[in-house]
Amino acid sequence: MKLILAEPFKRLWAGRDAFDAVEALQGEVYRELEGRRTLRTVVAGEGFFVKIHRGIGWGEIFKNLFTAKLPVLGAGQEWRAIQRLHEVGVPTMTAVAYGERGSNPAAQHSFIITEELAPTVSLEDFSLNWVKQPPQPRLKHALIAEVARMTGMMHRAGVNHRDCYICHFLLHTD
């Protein structure tokens, strides 16, 4: 078993089973799939995003392998990617809790909790009206250059973001 807890979870979950505690978190559900749940919650007055993985089964593992993709077995890959991005200076979210238990890769239970990035707007939402209301070329070129810089740093660091879309790039609005 692996368990890493930073505040406020370290204090709030002391003496408790962290896996039971994470499953009990309530909030706005963003994604609910078989074996995986993503939600936004508030703990100690702060916003967090929670991803819980409950195992994907051998069928999903073999399906991924037969299509030449490595399966996502749990939260560990995201935890390691976030740590690596911080090491090389790529701006990204901050993970504050991670847990993984079970040796069977098809049934592994894991979770990751990240601090909410707020206030932000996704680059996708920011650019929605660009067909009707194009931005200044200088702004558009600056955004393209920054996305290219971040993506290049990510790839040079060995991090492969399997769904690298503009909706995952957030602009701070404050």
Q: Language-model segments: which ranges?
A:
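Conserved catalytic core of two-component sensor histidine kinases
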Residues: 148
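N-terminal positively charged amphipathic segments used for targeting/anchoring
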Residues: 1-14
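Hydrophobic residue at the +6 position relative to the catalytic HRD Asp in the kinase catalytic loop
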Residues: 164-171
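AlphaC helix of the protein kinase catalytic domain
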Residues: 122-134
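Active-site mouth loops of central-metabolism enzymes
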Residues: 136-141
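Conserved ATP-binding subdomain of kinase catalytic cores across diverse folds
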Residues: 16-124, 152, 156-157, 162
